[in-house]
């Protein structure tokens, strides 16, 4: 537990800089010995594991993590948890009343918020690139929404990386901030990209798939 707290203190400033938002909330962390212990605990039994995806969970304002001897995995869980708190503060405010009313008004897709948490917590990697490549070249997805429905965290992480690469990294958090101000993803998208939100999603599918097709053709011709 002490190691997890030290890790959280160490990671917090960099993530606050990234999200451009400080946390006023005290973050409590509960550490389990392994994932099975967490799932079987009273806390774990209250979580719908099938539908909650891979982002670090919170129960009664406590960050729930597990440590199985893999320090990098624990660090990733804690970074995700901190990013989640900071993102919720950014979108919904620190005050509980403000939080509830903003949450009701701002209904963002899960892939978008969880993807942002992944993007903030973990650098893009060759493994993620391989996953994206096989998803986009599989022919299973006619549009972004089908992809995001099937693989929300991967789609969301890749989307924010796409925004950073094509529309400046500074605009990643700004995009979400504008969505909060305007209560609209379309307005935020028009401001950042000069395109409607759906057009940006189509652009993502075309550009990313095209990049992988070119890569494949290049290898065949080599």
Regions found by a protein language model. Name each.
Residues 35-52:
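Charged, often glycine-rich, active-site loop that binds/positions anionic groups
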Residues 1-3, 37-41, 127:
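Short, solvent-exposed loop/turn elements at domain surfaces
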Residues 126-179:
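Long, well-structured alpha-helical subdomains associated
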Residues 52-127, 134, 173:
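Zinc-dependent metallopeptidase catalytic helix centered on the HExxH motif
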Residues 11-19, 81-82, 86-94, 116, ...:
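Sec/Tat-exported extracytoplasmic proteins
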